[in-house]
């Protein structure tokens, strides 16, 4: 069995996928460019990947391929309909980061509500505290987390856990119904109503044609000027141009992002550049999922997916 891992550096070097118990060859590449994917995959029975794109045209040229083992939860880099038509199994790993991502979101909430970014940056770049003439200074807003309203968009594993933890902190939690829904399900609140009420909006919905640019100029305009946006879901859920305009013009109070539309971003990405000067914009490099325990769970489950597929033949 020939197994090829196309983007080994997409998971931390400290964690390796356990090798299968059955006879196999295992080849790894740090990363794979689109023009390299076919050549590296053409003789593979199993491809392991996180983000390498497999569309219908490419999959149709890989008659040996039996399984794509995804080292992630999301599968939007794979044409799932084409894989099904061609008899290629696709196995992902849901739920492995159900502790790590919610904890990251909570960290972002506290960072935004207590203006950690601005206060820390002042000390690093301008010695503001040393020259202020007082034991403290309050240049940036500090607001309580307890009592704030959290609007959760996406009530899956991650969104539900974020909501549970937020309630333990004394927050009021609203789960948003789908945009434009004709009926409001029990336990949900109408989409626009959540945007209008929330002090913090956090995104945990999958990326689909419907959710792309879910947060745009129109939806940002519905948010309070004192509200914050958090995105640890998928970059394209947010219109980055509209978000930057909202931040620079005070239409919302701040944002924290773990994902961007293009990853890795270009050096001149406007949001990246803005984060160097704005005290209310926090960007982390898609690491919300990557706690030690989460990555351990991930690599073990990928290995188990491969073992189970070969043992069961499906």
Regions inferred by a protein language model and the residue ranges of each:
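N-terminal glycine-/charge-rich "phosphate-binding" loop or analogous flexible N-terminal tail
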Residues: 1-44
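Rossmann-like dinucleotide-binding domain for NAD(H)/NADP(H)
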Residues: 226, 232-314
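An anion/phosphate-binding loop that grips the pyrophosphate of nucleotide cofactors and donors
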Residues: 44, 62, 197-198, 226
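Rossmann-like dinucleotide/phosphate-binding beta-alpha-beta segment
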Residues: 136-225
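Short beta->alpha connector loops at strand-helix junctions that form conserved
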Residues: 30, 71-72, 88-99, 177, ...
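Short glycine-/small-residue-rich Rossmann-like dinucleotide-binding loops
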Residues: 52, 73, 199, 205-207, ...
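Phosphate-binding beta-alpha-beta segment of Rossmann-like dinucleotide-binding domains, i.e.
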Residues: 86, 94-149
């Amino acid at each position: 069995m020939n197994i090829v891992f196309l983007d080994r550096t997409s998971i931390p070097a400290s964690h390796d996928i356990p090798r299968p118990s059955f006879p196999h060859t295992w080849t790894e590449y740090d990363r794979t460019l689109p023009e390299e994917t076919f050549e590296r995959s053409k003789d593979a029975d199993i491809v392991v990947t996180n983000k390498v794109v497999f569309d219908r045209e490419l999959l149709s040229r890989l008659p040996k391929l039996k399984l794509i083992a995804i080292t992630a939860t999301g599968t939007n880099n794979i044409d799932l309909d084409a894989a099904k038509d061609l008899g290629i199994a696709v196995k992902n790993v849901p739920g492995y980061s159900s502790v790590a991502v919610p904890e990251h979101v909570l960290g972002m909430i506290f960072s935004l509500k207590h203006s950690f970014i601005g206060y820390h940056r002042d000390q690093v770049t301008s010695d503001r505290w040393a020259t202020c003439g007082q034991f403290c200074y309050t240049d940036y807003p500090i607001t309580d987390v307890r009592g704030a309203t959290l609007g959760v968009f996406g009530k899956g594993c991650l969104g539900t856990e974020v909501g549970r933890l937020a309630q333990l902190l004394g927050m009021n939690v609203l789960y948003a119904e789908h945009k434009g829904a004709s009926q409001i399900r029990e336990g949900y609140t109408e989409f626009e109503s959540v945007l209008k009420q929330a002090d913090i909006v956090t995104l945990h919905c999958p990326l689909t044609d419907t959710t792309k640019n879910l947060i745009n100029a129109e939806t940002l305009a519905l948010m309070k000027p004192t509200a914050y946006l958090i995105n640890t879901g998928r970059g394209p859920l947010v219109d980055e141009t509209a978000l930057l305009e909202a931040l620079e013009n005070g239409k919302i109070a701040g944002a924290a992002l773990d994902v961007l539309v293009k990853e890795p971003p270009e050096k001149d990405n406007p949001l990246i550049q803005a984060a160097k000067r704005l005290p209310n914009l926090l960007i982390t490099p898609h690491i919300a999922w990557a706690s030690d325990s989460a990555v351990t769970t991930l690599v073990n489950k990928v290995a188990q997916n491969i073992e189970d597929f070969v043992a069961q033949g499906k």
